[in-house]
């Protein structure tokens, strides 16, 4: 059995370190005691990763033999986590050439093992081009002369992965779906945490193996079932799914492209692969790697992990924070812009002719009797509607007119985070088809000027949530623009008078002069 907890300081190369799997594998390898060389076509693409300072970054274009020779020098285990999906052109030929170049370079460098993550392959079915290419890459690497372990997985469940994001967007945005026949194809999904567990564990196997292993979670179900399970776990009503035989995989890939923000170049091969049954044919990996402690992760738990940050009202943190995520299922700041579900943001910044302290006093005094510095009638009407629907409305006020603490109620908001003098984060507790936050922060620009930044964030729940955001978006300039101007003006007045301003300006009135934008 491998030692999955101690890499013994051995050096591993992770190609595709800027990608979804690679970016999450690197910190797992570091925690297991390995030294990590993180490879990518451009090293600059690695700098935004939170683990960048703990690895040796290296250029590793898998089509460039010279770069690979340098990247593989002294490496014990090399992870091959690249493929040409979404790249356009003849991606099969590109994948084929890259695997040959990499295998030859690894053999020349004396690499002990190659580890490749491929796709789960059906039996006795015509493969999609995507699955066919993944299978061929595995065969090329196993024939390279370097012992190679190929882990074959179907749909990987974790925020940021293309397959999961497609599932997320389809389910959230379409309460009623007319779908092709592939919705009833059998699939054995696996949680990202289990994929990473196996990827790390196989590096510690001392036996010389040159073969593929099927890996999958404990659930076998259809794509239709997966969408219904996602809806249930995320709190959405059961979806109405009508299957029609006329939608071919090619046509349905265009449909997916219209409904979701997943790029067409990625969505098309994924959809075409859904026509194939992808269920594990064996569990031979168990003879070399024990199941994770507590067993493999079921679909519902995997979905819960992928949605934990949303469920726990922490979306604003994980979409904007560059810290290492708590679990592999969490979003990462380097995930593509279309990953993580919809998050709508109204982001405004302006320079304030006041000290940071004066601006902060106004910010922490917001709400209650001081009001919200913008269109009082609109806030009162919204508060009344919230009360009528069973929400708190504006009646809660605030505990103290001058002091705020984490957990305090402020009208229909709750103080989620305070970074004294810098940030006030409020979470909405009003009745909404989604989750909402308001960030009010004090910053300074490179000229030493005080900058007020105001962000309203909304994570919609289902199609109703999408419709809600776009229905109120035309009023944001009046509501949020007025709030920003009046908070800034209140701070300037407070600076001159030496005291905070207690009364919000009426109707989102503009400032008395043009206010420079922050740069």
Q: Model-found features: residue ranges?
A:
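N-terminal Rossmann NAD(P)H-binding glycine-rich loop of SDR-like oxidoreductase domains
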Residues: 2-34
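Oxidoreductase cofactor-interface core, primarily capturing Rossmann-like NAD(P)-dependent enzymes
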Residues: 25, 32, 124-236, 254-262
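A hydrophobic C-terminal alpha-helical subdomain
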Residues: 247-338, 403
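NAD(P)H-binding glycine-rich loop region in Rossmannoid oxidoreductase-like domains
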Residues: 44-109, 119-126
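Hydrophobic ligand-binding cavity/cleft-lining segments
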Residues: 203, 297-300, 304, 308-393, ...
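SDR active-site strand-loop-helix element
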Residues: 15, 39, 81, 114-119, ...
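A conserved amphipathic terminal alpha-helix motif
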Residues: 465-505, 510-513
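Beta-strand/loop substructures that line and gate deep hydrophobic ligand-binding cavities in soluble
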Residues: 428-477
